[in-house]
Every structure is written in structure tokens, then in C-alpha cells.
From Swiss-Prot:
Name of the molecule in the record: Large ribosomal subunit protein bL9
Keywords, comma-separated and alphabetical: Ribonucleoprotein, Ribosomal protein, RNA-binding, rRNA-binding
Gene coding for it: rplI
InterPro entries on file: Ribosomal_bL9, Ribosomal_bL9/RNase_H1_N, Ribosomal_bL9_bac/chp, Ribosomal_bL9_C, Ribosomal_bL9_C_sf, Ribosomal_bL9_N, Ribosomal_bL9_N_sf
Top-level taxon: Bacteria
Listed GO MF terms: rRNA binding; structural constituent of ribosome
Amino acid sequence: MKVIFLEDVKGKGKKGEIKEVPTGYAQNFLIKKNLAKEATSQTIGELKGKQKAEEKAQAEILAEAKETKKALEDEKTVVSFSEKVGPDGRTFGSITAKKISEELKKQFDITVDKRHIELDHPIRAIGLIEVPVKLHKEVKAEIKLRIDQA
């Protein structure tokens, strides 16, 4: 019996795959547990339509990520911070991914999720710093930060 997998099933198939499996296994396990459905011409057509829509959505997300990268890597896009500095040259407060994301939105109206900003640890130094950002699995960019003494 041909089935379309609705979920990943270890050793049998991945979500969206169309495979031939034993009839008993399909009816008594896969279909009952909503892990798969019978592959009819109608369900195959629905699957193809969903896959096309998903590909289109992924292409839009990729295009948006490339647009954001272009905006971030513009020479004028330098996020400015003004922090109090102690005698050792380190800031009193630290600059986190959340702060960077908020300032980017406030200063340049560019939205970047704080989870995409790749900071190993919060920034406590002053000066010019470049921070890597992973906008998409294929698109990486750098945010330029200028941290001045208040």
C-alpha cells in the first residue's frame, strides 16, 4: 500500500515522502496513529501543492534575509551605544544581543531576532566591534557597533 508520511517514522520514511509499505502496517499502525495517510491521486496533488507553497515561502524568507543583510552591511549602519565606563576601560553595564536588537530597531528600523545575533558573551569593551548575525541558514551578516563613553 502506498502512503504519504505525515511525520518522520524511524526506519520507514520522512515527512512528505510517498512510500510503499505493507498494507497491515499502514492500516493498523501508520494511519491509526496519524503518522501517514493513504496515497491517492487527490492526496498526492494536495502534497505537491503544499510543497510548492512551502518552497515559495522559503524563497521569500531567503529574499528577506538577503535584503536585511544588505541593510546591515551598509556603511551607514553603525549601531551606537553610549555607556558609562569604569577606570579599567570596561563598561559598567554589558551589551547583550537583546540590547543590540532593540537599538537596531530603534535607530535604523531593521528587525533582527536577538537569537540570530551570535554573541559568545556580552560586550563590555568600548570601541568599534563587528558582531556576526545568522539571518538564514544560507545568509550571514555582520552588525557594526560603536560603543562610546557616556
